[in-house]
Amino acid sequence: SPSQDFMRF
């Protein structure tokens, strides 16, 4: 989800 896109590390 876009809201969790920052978690894609």
From Swiss-Prot:
<feature type="modified residue" description="Phenylalanine amide">
    <location>
        <position position="9"/>
    </location>
</feature>
<dbReference type="GO" id="GO:0005576">
    <property type="term" value="C:extracellular region"/>
</dbReference>
<comment type="function">
    <text>Able to induce fluid secretion from the isolated salivary gland of Calliphora.</text>
</comment>
<keyword id="KW-0964">Secreted</keyword>
<protein>
    <recommendedName>
        <fullName>CalliFMRFamide-3</fullName>
    </recommendedName>
</protein>
<keyword id="KW-0027">Amidation</keyword>
<keyword id="KW-0527">Neuropeptide</keyword>
<dbReference type="GO" id="GO:0007218">
    <property type="term" value="P:neuropeptide signaling pathway"/>
</dbReference>
<comment type="similarity">
    <text>Belongs to the FARP (FMRFamide related peptide) family.</text>
</comment>
